[in-house]
């Protein structure tokens, strides 16, 4: 479910354009990493 949330956040139309999230990961790796950390780390 967390992975689905991350993908929706990166590319809401991921089903229609499956390469959108790949392009975002290549262009904005830092933001993606921060999103993944924020969604996987427990809230303090």
UniProtKB/Swiss-Prot annotation:
Q: Pfam families in the record, alphabetically?
A: Corona_NS1
Q: Which InterPro entries match?
A: Corona_NS1 (IPR009314)
Q: What does the sequence similarity comment in the record state about its family? A: Belongs to the coronaviruses ns4.9 protein family.
Report the protein name in the record.
Answer: Non-structural protein of 4.9 kDa
């Amino acid at each position: 479910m967390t992975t689905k949330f991350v993908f929706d956040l990166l590319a809401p139309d991921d089903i229609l354009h499956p390469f959108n999230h790949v392009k975002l990961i290549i262009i904005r790796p830092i933001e993606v990493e921060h999103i993944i950390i924020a969604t996987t780390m427990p809230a303090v």
